[in-house]
């Protein structure tokens, strides 16, 4: 199993950072390689957590992949991501949003995955650089939205 961890320190409130990451529908506007997002289901659970199931179509290194994730969003604190179907045997992730001082926040991303198939296993070595570009794109979007 491979693991990716990234952390950002931003001069925006945690709630602003959370809103950008939770807005799955907008990913195609700013994430590199994200061709489209289709929200399949949205619901609010009894504990105040919202759950969004979405199909993402992404391209990288000439390979186009489609995957479905379920995102469980604890408002302004955490977003847990779990693969429902796609090119991985397993993909779990978690975004956390922690206030720092009066107007800043720390945003952390942890991903764990097991690639499926020989081609995906070969390409999985590039996931670190893909994650860096993705986190950078989120940081730019968060800062421009605030």
Language-model-detected regions and their locations in the chain:
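Hydrophobic ligand-binding cavity/cleft-lining segments
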Residues: 1-46
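Exposed loop/turn and edge beta-strand positions of beta-sandwich/beta-sheet ligand-binding modules
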Residues: 4, 91, 109
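A conserved amphipathic terminal alpha-helix motif
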Residues: 112-146
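Hydrophobic-ligand binding "helix-grip"
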Residues: 28-29, 36, 41-43, 57-104, ...
């Amino acid at each position: 199993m491979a693991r990716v961890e990234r952390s950002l320190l931003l001069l925006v409130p945690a709630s602003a950072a959370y809103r950008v990451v939770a807005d799955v529908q907008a990913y195609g506007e700013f994430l590199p390689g994200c061709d489209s997002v289709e929200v399949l289901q949205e619901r609010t659970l009894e504990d105040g957590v919202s759950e969004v199931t979405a199909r993402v179509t992404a391209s990288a290194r000439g390979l186009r992949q489609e995957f479905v994730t379920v995102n469980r969003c604890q408002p302004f604190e955490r977003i847990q991501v779990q693969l429902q179907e796609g090119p991985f045997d397993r993909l779990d992730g978690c975004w956390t949003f922690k206030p720092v001082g009066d107007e800043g926040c720390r945003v952390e991303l942890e991903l764990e995955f097991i690639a499926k198939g020989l081609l995906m296993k070969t390409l999985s070595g590039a996931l670190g650089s893909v994650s860096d570009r993705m986190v950078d794109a989120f940081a730019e979007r968060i800062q421009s939205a605030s």
